[in-house]
Amino acid sequence: MKDTSTSQLAGKFLLEEIQARGLTQKELARRMGRPLNVINEIINGRKAITAETALQLEEVMPEIPARFWLNLETDFQLTKALVNKQTQKASSVREK
């Protein structure tokens, strides 16, 4: 289990959706009223999808509800927490 897999999936999904609509990251950023670097960081899995971002994405792509975007982010955070927990367990076992 990789801690970036879900985040990368969300970013890849977002990129595929904007490309399917003939948009660029720059145009998406403009429509959302967000800086381009924020969109790029989300697409590359380095920035979280917040509730505000999810609502903005829903405004630009109304057929994809904000809840969907938030669920992707929640899944990523849970995956990351599980990986951290497993890493901590493995470290404590090695120390014994």
Predicted segments, located by residue:
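A short, Lys/Arg-rich alpha-helix, primarily the initiator
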Residues: 1-23
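DNA major-groove recognition helix of helix-turn-helix
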Residues: 18, 43, 53, 61, ...
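Short polybasic/polar patches that bind polyanions
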Residues: 19, 30, 59
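Short alpha-helical DNA-recognition segment
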Residues: 22-41
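DNA major-groove recognition helix of helix-turn-helix/homeodomain DNA-binding modules
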Residues: 52-68
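Short amphipathic recognition helices of helix-turn-helix/homeodomain-type DNA-binding modules
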Residues: 65-90
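Extended catalytic-interface subdomain
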Residues: 95-96
